[in-house]
Amino acid sequence: MTTGFLQKIFGSRNQRLVKQYQKTVTTINALETQIEKLTDDQLRGKTDEFRQRVAAGESLDKLLPEAFAVCREASRRVLKMRHFDVQMIGGMVLHYGKIAEMRTGEGKTLVATLPVYLNALAGRGVHVVTVNDYLAQRDAEWMARLYNFLGLSVGINLSGMEHDQKQQAYAADITYGTNNEFGFDYLRDNMVYETDARVQRALNFAVVDEVDSILIDEARTPLIISGQAEDHTELYVRMNALPPLLERQIGEEKADGTGVEKPGDYTLDEKARQVFLTESGHEKAERLLAEWGLIGEGESLYAPQNITLMHHVYAALRAHTLFHKDQHYVVQNGEVVIVDEFTGRLMAGRRWSDGLHQAVEAKEHVKIQSENQTLASITFQNYFRMYAKLAGMTGTADTEAYEFNEIYGLETVVIPTNRPPKRIDKQDQIYKTAKERYDAVIRDIRDCYERGQPVLVGTTSIENSELLSHLLKQAGLPHEVLNAKQHEREAAIVAEAGRPKRVTIATNMAGRGTDIVLGGNAEKQAAFIEADEAIPADEKARRIQQLHDEWETLHEQVKAAGGLHIIGTERHESRRIDNQLRGRAGRQGDPGSSRFYLSLDDPLLRIFAGDRVRSIMDRLKMPEGEAIEAGIVTRSIESAQRKVEARNFDIRKQLLEYDDVSNDQRKVIYQQRNELLEAHDITETITAMRHGVVTEVVRQFVPEGSIEEQWDVPELEEALRNDWQLDLAIQEMVNESSSITAEEILDAVMTAADEQYEAKVAMVGRESFSAFERSVMLQTVDRLWREHLAALDHLRQGIHLRGYAQKNPKQEYKREAFELFAAMLEAIKQEVTRVVMNVQIQSPEQLEQAAEQIEERGGHLENVEYQHADYAEAGAPVANVAVAAAATATADMVGSAMTHSGPGGEMPKVGRNDPCPCGSGKKYKQCHGKLS
């Protein structure tokens, strides 16, 4: 109550910010007359003037009014578009590192030009991030005219580009690209063997378009670069025969033994998207696997020799019970292609991890591709948090404002619309069955069609969109289908969706990023005519003019019919996705309407609110085809959505907490790797490693401060001979001197190791040997890092079970991840020392050839795949999902106290007495700083 009272007096935080920015807009508007008088050359010259002022120490904040005024005037001249005042406010929100929520059609692409121009003046690069290559290329080509006019260079970073093209794109003042490609480039830059092979500069400022899609929807999905691992193709095929032989149990057994409606072999938890074998299911699976010869007669699935089979059993079960064709994936050209559950788009090249994809391939009887080993990985959460400044824009962020602030430290500011919205959002209609719901949808579409009103129908899956398309064909209603299967025709379909009598079916937000203009998008159609080389120039001009004349008539006709009507055939589990669908109507003050049609069979209602609503319908004795339309029901659905959103937020937050463990490690390992690349001579590092390993080996057989009776000299001599080809007569030294100490033996071994090392260096020269050492070190770090990632992945699979032992899974994961990491560091030191000490050298040329072979083996991996693997979709338990990113992200640690500005941004200097970033609690110098 107090908060509401204070808001009435002082206004909300959002209102105060907008008011504050409005004052700056007044300052910018006052400069407009003066800027308008400048010639094109003088306007372009302002960029050089601004750059000099920034170089002289003037802040970008102080420069903002002039820079925004110049950018607005340049846009008016080049693009024939002048930024509205509310767009200037949006530009300021982005410059100050916040999220701007702007309604559909308010010109987000144009808004971005203001902060992008201002921040590009500093010369440190600006990244504009979009959700797909089409939007990146469209926006870059569209806005490049403005930036080039102002003297700034623009690069486009697309998947499949050549290395040189990528370097040029990143060297430009402004770089457009997709979130996936920016993330993969960061990972690839940390796998190179030469400094000039990197493409990215330090991560300075990013403007993320559709920020909710990238930072919220895809936050659970790490970017993974992987290579082929061991082949289990035959096992997936044989295991595929198991799920059809098992029956689902209906109901959950309670403590008193009741609750099971129908006994079975496995239970499904749709809410958590998990599948579990029951006791009888285990017995049946074991019996069948024994019959097929996969396990011994009478053996348990949990026997040590069979434990890996459990992975295949559950992968096959999840593939058959939780993942459905044309909903979660499609089969295209003999391959299983994932459908993004948030956008409905096909995710070509992306694969589920943990063997799930292979299990689905076996289920669909297509060629099974080999399992992969993770080479490098990062989550979007941790990638985008590395930027010095981050901003974003979207049409729907306010429902997730808390998460943006909590996870990324980004405040959300709702930007006022340029014209007041006129869209009418009607109450949901809820039917008993899906058939009744679709009958009502068809009636509504027919009514709109007869009145000449365009309709956009949103569905939650490809399967539903094709079902509705079939029903519309039966009803004789012409329509277009816009889903992942028609991706290529997407732009053309969206361009026409606002014409009279046009019916368009879209999965979720397919076509997002393109406005639906009432009367049809004449500009888009004009562009198609312009691009057709077969049409003569005068004919093009005539047709384009005719298009614009027709559009005026159609535009007024559609407005009179009520504008675009949105029909939702199901509620998504996120209110934000529903709001995005609604937001397609009523752009820039146009009329429009929306309504959702639901049935009690919908997953959201069935899981969260079905029983309550069904009892209301039964009590009211509602006849078939009659709908409930009441605020109380709509509110209960929104309450269910809030529960799901809260649960998903908890999953993402938990995932981040696990991922932070490995993220610190990744930063340090990548920092160390970059230092190795840039160092001309790593002798000191190699010497420190050798001394550490030699000391450890000697101490195993001759402990510090021990007496002769405790020594095992013969074993020490054998270890030195086998490991490093050091033939030392230590027993003779002991026999000759009765007073020899453990320290003297260590010194003798150390001296011999140093002499052998120096002899190798002398044969080929310091520079050649140092280059060889660097290659060995990089290849060893990369190989053991990959093995470490696999170990962490294995660790995350079962860490949630520690909760049953009254232990905190996060703390246990942190502790064991550190132990694994420490073991990896020891292995790196031992492996590098072993290779360097054992290498047989005849000539510098031979050494150079060996270094090249090492780099080739490490740097040119065959069958490398770039995955955006959703662990949550793989049906892992919630706690397990959360660990997923941590496991994939721990690409992290060889430690070094040196500082380096690497390709992925400024790496913080770790002081010798600072806590070690690995989380052990020790000082850096006593932990991973030892390596350097």
UniProtKB/Swiss-Prot annotation:
It catalyses: ATP + H2O + cellular proteinSide 1 = ADP + phosphate + cellular proteinSide 2. May bind 1 zinc ion per subunit. Its cofactor is Zn(2+). Keywords: ATP-binding, Cell inner membrane, Cell membrane, Cytoplasm, Membrane, Metal-binding, Nucleotide-binding, Protein transport, Translocase, Translocation, Transport, Zinc. It holds the Pfam family SEC-C. The keyword Cytoplasm applies. InterPro entries: Helicase_ATP-bd, Helicase_C-like, P-loop_NTPase, SEC_C_motif, SecA, SecA_CS, SecA_DEAD, SecA_motor_DEAD. Zn(2+) binds at C916, C918, C927, H928. Part of the Sec protein translocase complex. Interacts with the SecYEG preprotein conducting channel. Has a central role in coupling the hydrolysis of ATP to the transfer of proteins into and across the cell membrane, serving both as a receptor for the preprotein-SecB complex and as an ATP-driven molecular motor driving the stepwise translocation of polypeptide chains across the membrane. Monomer and homodimer. Part of the essential Sec protein translocation apparatus which comprises SecA, SecYEG and auxiliary proteins SecDF-YajC and YidC. This is Protein translocase subunit SecA. It comes from Burkholderia lata (strain ATCC 17760 / DSM 23089 / LMG 22485 / NCIMB 9086 / R18194 / 383). The gene is secA.
